[in-house]
């Protein structure tokens, strides 16, 4: 009787070992399918949208900061907002966002191309320099000449949104 019980235990042990190996093989198969099927990845990529800034209908290349103000602005503007901006001081364009968003102002000296939040509800784009207390939102990647021709006007129209 002891021999029969011992034989059954050995068979059960081998059966359990076989189950654990097939589990690993299924896991490996899933990993292989993930790497061999780029369709899933590209489908996800195509669903992602890009947050775009346009000045007078010209798309500008901007590098956004990673902060709460930018996150809130992007969430607010994801369906698109249009802001009429007015030149101020001969070095910046200023326009109301239309709502108050989180700010973390600090005394900074801006450079041409800097995009900042002022008073938690206004966006400012610089084509000159200034020192004041702002929350930096980003920087437009253009040279001084390009910024001047785009922004050195009495008014510009700024559009923000996902595309």
Label for each model-derived stretch:
Residues 1-4:
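Positively charged n-region of N-terminal signal peptides that target proteins for export
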Residues 15-18:
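C-terminal motif of bacterial Sec signal peptides marking the signal peptidase cleavage site
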Residues 21-52, 57-59:
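N-terminal, intrinsically disordered, polar/charged segments of Gram-positive cell-envelope systems
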Residues 45-82, 91:
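Extracytoplasmic/periplasm-facing segments of secreted or lipoprotein envelope proteins
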Residues 69-119:
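Mature extracytoplasmic domains of secretory-pathway proteins
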Residues 119-120, 159:
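Residue-level recognition of conserved beta-strand edge/terminus positions
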Residues 127-142:
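Short, compositionally biased
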Residues 138-163:
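Well-ordered alpha/beta subsegment
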